[in-house]
Amino acid sequence: MTRHANRLSLVIAALGMAALGAGPAPANQDAPAPKPHYLSQPLVTSVYTADPSAHVFGGRIYVYASHDTEEGPPLADVEPFKNSEGGAFKMRDYVVLSMANPQAPVQVHRNVLDIADVPWAARQMWAPDAAYRNGTYYLYFPAKDRAGAFRIGVATSKQPAGPFRARPEPIKGSFSIDPAVFVDDDGKSYMYFGGLSGGQLQKNIGGVYDPNGPGGDPRAKDEQAFMPQVAKLRGDILEFAEKPREALIVDEKGKPLLSGDGDRRFFEASWMHKYRGKYYFSYSTGGSHFIVYAVGSSPYGPFTYKGKILLPVDGWTTHHSIVEHKGRWWLFYADTQLSGKTWLRNVKATELFYNRDGTIRTIDPFVTRK
């Protein structure tokens, strides 16, 4: 059994225990002494955070993060990573981490946005993203409505760390999870989104939610994989300017990746950045636990698969963002170093490097593997 499988077995076994609560991360305490097998240490230990979306506003880095709760998954979710609802992940609000640089002290901003202040949302505020335009900061977030369907909402603030005020309705035509907003050099903005299984992409064929749709990927291994969605945003970046379409990910021969290609096909966690005029679309492969990337010449794709950015971390989920700050590139990601529980994560950062040909050097989150 692999190192990752051993850890996953331990996590699943722990879920069957009666005492499912987790002790809180120690408040106002410095990060623990570095352990030799971790490449990076948690940015903060006073709060559990995940799904980091990093941006540079006014020269400072702001990381928009999910806020993991300490309730633990219900006993019905003994395998919460495989069921169709993602019941172990019950996040109700967001946290922002800000810093002068990834190696500087981190300020934790709370009271960013709470589900109680989102009129249309019922539960599960998952991975967010943010953008800036004309003096206003925009927070994009998925949540389930009262029908149990994931929609994507938007909230605004005059300050990068909020508090944000949500609009009364989700973005028209939005569905699934993991919004990632990319502003191109010409000022046009695009949203990438989607996630399989608990993210409901497979329940939204043609953008229409089917509550009785499959809980997981229904496609045969030799069928085209589900693809991420992309849509240009209106000038005010509050709504879609067009109907979402597939952002096609292809292999080196130009053929769409297949559903059975677990090490390369899209699962969730879209991110877009630009490097030397090319569009780098990165994402999580889900069950194989990689962060990988594909490159294209248009924000719509197609994107040709290139390789792995991040090898598997502690915990089941893997989610990331990539940002440039003062001439250096950084990867933000999360693992479960602090808690050892997949639903209680901590955000980390490490420097990212390109090769001369524009490919990205693969990062191992462990200095030495167990």
Protein language model annotation of sequence segments:
Residues N28-K370:
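Carbohydrate-active catalytic/glycan-binding domains of CAZyme proteins
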Residues S9-G21:
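Bacterial N-terminal signal peptides
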Residues M1-V11:
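Bacterial N-terminal signal peptides that target proteins for export
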